[in-house]
């Protein structure tokens, strides 16, 4: 059975007019009659393309300030007509077949993103006729081609040129899927917008909320994976549509094997941690926890110091930088250790050549970043999801409250703030020991905080790193003084923690007894 369908009549009505003139001209060259509306029609006519206004085709003018343009049986009958079945009905009602529909929708997302957007502005940017035509054409994809993305224009024209003005069923089916994805995303945006507000012209006594009644999100599959977190689990990686922040989702892979499920999770942890620093920094992650973090005068120094924290755990780890990967640093990495992933804002040609000697190493370029974008984190639980704001909180020196008898030194303050940034990305209960802008011990994921403190000390001792004179960060308050006592016994001289425990006085007294300085942040950084 022939599944090719010739295109003889097109309907073009787009908000984003990128490439539409060239596309229409190519259709015209194939002998296609073109229908259009409003601004699209004027643009095509101004560029010398023969076009028929939809209102002339239907015999009915646009009404209600353009709210009703294409909602007419001559349009939807022409789109939905089943070839070989509905011809008599079409003839009886003077309906002509429409073979291709090219539509993209009113820019609702851009409108509501504007600070001064009113409810009325939002309402007027809800497209009605567009989604209706898109869904109709997608439903009848057996006979009709639907195009919602300008990136598909060339594909359609190329196929028509290769198939005597026709498109194949495979292409129409693929474009229909894209159309349904497009309208689903569009309706989801509208539902999200209205779901978190109460119109100011109602008498309903309720407040706006940042969390809508339902959540509608759309992600696009980037890759299928060999398996998930474990080999018996199937997996795929989906990326958020329209994301602009530098991330593992937007990164470009220059070389190496395909990223695994765990690679992606660990790379995300490493990159988000290194973003906290505005001086050359390196973060090495293993199983989603930083095992070595350092700042330096350059990224080579930062890497060497980060590696020094825990060389054993760094084996097979993920390395993230906040500056360009240069040749000297690349050389140090490939000569010193086995690494799964290296990610940086950019990679020099010389560095890329050096890393290419290790073909299995996954080398990623994520681009430079400025500020982290506000947004929400989602955690899956059985039967639901937990939604919260991204943890973008961070303190500066001016936010700290000194509660100990001894004031921290200037160097201790620098190290405390460094240590606090690292602790934010360590699984709770998190304890981090650091000195001179370098971690010397990380205690992660323990059920009791005192054991995390002990593990941080053990890690430092195992690598012959001097704890005496170092500082400690805790992601949450100390419920008892035992964590402070363990740190003091190891040689810690200053502590940064949120405070807020019922036993804060006891904990502060323990610090004073040991001659330690203690500062409170008033901010917790649990990470589960």
From Swiss-Prot:
Catalytic activity: (6R)-10-formyltetrahydrofolate + 5-amino-1-(5-phospho-beta-D-ribosyl)imidazole-4-carboxamide = 5-formamido-1-(5-phospho-D-ribosyl)imidazole-4-carboxamide + (6S)-5,6,7,8-tetrahydrofolate; IMP + H2O = 5-formamido-1-(5-phospho-D-ribosyl)imidazole-4-carboxamide
The protein's annotated pathway: Purine metabolism; IMP biosynthesis via de novo pathway; 5-formamido-1-(5-phospho-D-ribosyl)imidazole-4-carboxamide from 5-amino-1-(5-phospho-D-ribosyl)imidazole-4-carboxamide (10-formyl THF route): step 1/1; Purine metabolism; IMP biosynthesis via de novo pathway; IMP from 5-formamido-1-(5-phospho-D-ribosyl)imidazole-4-carboxamide: step 1/1
SUPFAM superfamilies noted in UniProt: Cytidine deaminase-like, Methylglyoxal synthase-like
Record domain MGS-like: where: 1-148
EC number from the UniProt entry: 2.1.2.3, 3.5.4.10
Gene3D superfamilies, per database record: 3.40.140.20, Methylglyoxal synthase-like domain
A Pfam family recorded for this sequence: AICARFT_IMPCHas
GO cellular component, one term: cytosol
Transmembrane segments: none
PANTHER family linked to this entry: BIFUNCTIONAL PURINE BIOSYNTHESIS PROTEIN ATIC, BIFUNCTIONAL PURINE BIOSYNTHESIS PROTEIN PURH
Name under which the protein is recorded: Bifunctional purine biosynthesis protein PurH
Organism of provenance: Pseudoalteromonas translucida (strain TAC 125)
Organism lineage: Bacteria, Pseudomonadati, Pseudomonadota, Gammaproteobacteria, Alteromonadales
């Amino acid at each position: 059975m022939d599944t090719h369908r010739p295109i003889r009549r097109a309907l073009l009505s787009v908000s984003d007019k990128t490439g539409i003139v060239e596309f229409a001209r190519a259709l015209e060259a194939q002998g296609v009659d073109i229908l259009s509306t409003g601004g699209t029609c004027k643009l095509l006519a101004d560029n010398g393309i023969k076009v028929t206004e939809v209102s002339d085709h239907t015999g009915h003018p646009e009404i209600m300030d353009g709210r009703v343009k294409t909602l007419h049986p001559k349009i939807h009958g022409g789109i939905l007509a089943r070839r070989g079945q509905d011809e008599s009905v079409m003839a009886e009602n003077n309906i002509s077949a429409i073979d291709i529909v090219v539509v993209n929708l009113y820019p609702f997302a851009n409108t509501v993103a504007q600070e001064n957007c009113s409810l009325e502005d939002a309402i007027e940017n809800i497209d009605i006729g567009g989604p209706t035509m898109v869904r109709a054409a997608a439903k009848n994809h057996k006979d009709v081609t639907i195009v919602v993305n300008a990136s598909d224009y060339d594909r359609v024209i190329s196929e028509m040129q290769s198939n005597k003005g026709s498109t194949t069923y495979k292409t129409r089916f693929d474009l229909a899927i894209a159309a349904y994805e497009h309208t689903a995303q569009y309706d989801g945006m509208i539902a999200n917008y209205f779901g978190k507000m109460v119109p100011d012209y109602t008498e309903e006594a309720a407040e706006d909320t940042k969390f809508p009644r339902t959540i509608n999100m759309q992600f696009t599959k980037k890759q299928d994976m060999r398996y998930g977190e474990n080999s018996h689990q199937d997996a795929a990686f989906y990326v958020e549509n329209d994301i602009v922040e530098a991330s593992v989702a937007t990164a470009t892979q220059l070389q190496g094997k395909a990223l695994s499920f765990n690679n992606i999770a660990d790379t995300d942890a490493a990159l988000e941690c290194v973003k906290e620093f505005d001086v050359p920094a390196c973060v090495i992650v293993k199983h989603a926890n930083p095992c070595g973090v350092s700042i330096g005068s350059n990224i080579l120094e930062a890497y060497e110091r980060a590696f020094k924290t825990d060389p054993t755990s760094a084996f097979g780890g993920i390395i993230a930088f906040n500056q360009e990967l240069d040749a000297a640093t690349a050389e140090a990495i490939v000569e010193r250790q086995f690494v799964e992933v290296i990610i940086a804002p950019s990679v020099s040609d010389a560095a890329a050549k050096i890393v290419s000697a290790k073909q299995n190493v996954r080398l990623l370029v994520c681009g430079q970043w400025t500020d982290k974008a506000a947004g929400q984190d989602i955690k899956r639980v059985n039967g639901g999801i937990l939604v919260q704001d991204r943890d973008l909180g961070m303190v500066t020196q001016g936010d700290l409250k000194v509660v100990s008898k001894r004031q921290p030194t200037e160097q201790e303050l620098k190290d405390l703030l460094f240590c606090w940034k690292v602790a934010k990305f360590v699984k709770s209960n998190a304890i981090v020991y650091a000195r001179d802008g370098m971690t010397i011990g990380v205690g992660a994921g323990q059920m009791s905080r005192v054991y995390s403190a002990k593990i941080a000390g053990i890690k430092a001792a195992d690598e012959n790193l001097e704890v005496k004179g170092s500082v400690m960060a805790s992601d949450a308050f100390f419920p008892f003084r035992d964590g402070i006592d363990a740190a003091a016994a190891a040689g810690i001289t200053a502590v940064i923690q949120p405070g807020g425990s019922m036993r804060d006085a006891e904990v502060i007294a323990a610090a004073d007894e040991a001659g330690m300085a203690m500062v409170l942040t008033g901010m917790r950084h649990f990470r589960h």
